[in-house]
From Swiss-Prot:
Keywords: Metal-binding, mRNA processing, Nucleus, Repeat, RNA-binding, Zinc, Zinc-finger. Belongs to the CPSF4/YTH1 family. This is mRNA 3'-end-processing protein yth1. InterPro entries: CPSF4/Yth1, Znf_CCCH, Znf_CCCH_sf. It comes from Aspergillus fumigatus (strain ATCC MYA-4609 / CBS 101355 / FGSC A1100 / Af293). GO terms for molecular function: RNA binding; zinc ion binding. A zinc finger (C3H1-type) spans 41-68, 91-113, 114-142, 143-167, 168-194.
């Protein structure tokens, strides 16, 4: 038995994984390559569309989609801009209207995905949007802005509904608990981080009716100021057009 262990160890140590591609392959390797592009050979070319901002094929693209940390040389687009890492998760508002002229060079996504739309400014300020359900932007509730409760994510929070943080009801991922989940961050189930030094949960502070009314009054005042600024801008624009209209009479005679 000892001889078998020694021979197996010697065989593993003497194996060159770079020459034997099947040495580090697992049963889930094809899934990772197809879904996330992990493990692609270095001789596979980098996707040109992805390097310019966005690839419509996504994970199904046969070429490599390197992350910014893996890129050794700074690739730039024709406009002189590097592929965006901050706007690449937001949908282009001009594309939704059919008015984007950048095409594949646009720093934003060209797809119909409401979950990746920017946040609605009107709803975020006042909790009300005049477009309602027809609005193309995200309506983020105040409760959704709270950070998740670490104690609840690990199974139990002693404060329950009185906790000042958000309690997200998700079942634990059985694959993550077993050691590895092939879905990674895209997994719909919870991947809790176990820690012994979690902060103690705090009580949620309920606002009084006077405080809520004061906030509503401030929001109404801000909306009125915005409407006033818009009216002034339109009136200035109208006066400018009227001022220039009719001034030019052409070249005079003689």
């Amino acid at each position: 038995m000892t001889a078998d262990v020694k021979s197996a160890a010697a065989r593993i140590l003497s194996t060159d994984s770079s020459r034997d591609p099947s040495f580090n392959n697992f049963s889930f390797t094809p899934f990772l390559r197809k879904s996330f592009g992990f493990g692609l050979a270095s001789d596979v070319p980098v996707c040109k569309a992805y390097s310019e901002g966005h690839c419509p094929l996504g994970p199904a693209c046969p070429d490599r989609h390197p992350t910014p940390s893996r890129v050794t040389t700074s690739t730039t687009t024709a406009s002189g801009l590097a592929p965006s890492t901050t706007h690449g998760s937001l949908v282009c508002k001009h594309f939704l209207k059919g008015l984007c002229k950048k095409g594949l060079k646009c720093e934003y996504l060209h797809e119909y995905n409401l979950r990746r739309m920017p946040e609605c400014q009107s709803f975020s300020r006042s909790g009300y949007c005049p477009n309602g359900d027809d609005c193309l932007y995200q309506h983020v509730r105040e409760q959704a802005r709270l950070p998740p409760c670490e104690n609840y994510d690990q199974g139990f929070c002693e404060l329950g509904p009185l906790c000042s943080k958000r309690h997200v009801r998700r079942r634990l991922c059985k694959y993550y608990l077993a050691g590895f989940c092939p879905e990674g961050k895209a997994c719909p189930d919870a991947h809790p981080r176990w820690s012994e030094n979690l902060p103690k949960p705090t009580m949620r502070v309920e606002k009084t009716e006077e405080e809520l009314e004061r906030e509503r009054a401030l929001i109404r005042e801000e909306q009125e100021r915005e409407k006033e600024r818009e009216r002034e801008w339109r009136s200035e624009r109208g006066r400018g057009g009227g001022f220039m209209r009719g001034r030019y009479r052409g070249r005079g005679r003689g």
